[in-house]
Amino acid sequence: MRTTVEQIGALIRATRKGLGVTPRELALTSGTGLRFDVDLERGKETCEIGKALTILQTLGIKLTLVSPSAVGKGE
């Protein structure tokens, strides 16, 4: 199953709201900037990966990467 930028943005938005954090507070805490945070939540495909990872970490969202060889081994 392919994960889309829109799905990642929706997860970030839902997590942020669930924590009671405003977009401005997230921008200040993560140091990424309000415009970037809003664009990422809206699923903008050209968002910088490093900043996106910073936001995920700030919100406590764990990202797991699985290589194709690991998938074939049932991992």
Enumerate the language-model features and the residues they cover:
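Alpha-helix boundary/capping and short turn/kink residues
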Residues: 2, 45-49
